[in-house]
Every structure is written in structure tokens, then in C-alpha cells.
């Protein structure tokens, strides 16, 4: 169960980072990198 939760959290983190990357094309930085990294641990 722990492994599943970690993989789900990691997926969410990559999703947030992906969204952040897309928004930066429009000079919009809504998703903070530090806030996203907390999902990796």
C-alpha cells in the first residue's frame, strides 16, 4: 500500500510539474516547484 501511495503521489508531482512547464510558455508560474517536490517524498 505504501508503494502504491508513493507512486500515485509521484504521478501527481510530475503532473503538476508538467502543468507548470506548459504555463511558463505563457509567462505564468502558478505551480511552485517546492510545493510540487513535497509530493515526491
Curated annotation (Swiss-Prot):
Keywords: Chloroplast, Plastid. The lineage of its organism: Eukaryota, Sar, Stramenopiles, Ochrophyta, Bacillariophyta. It comes from the Eukaryota. It is found in: Plastid, Chloroplast. This is Uncharacterized 4.7 kDa protein in ycf33-trnY intergenic region. It comes from Trieres chinensis (Marine centric diatom). GO terms for cellular component: chloroplast.
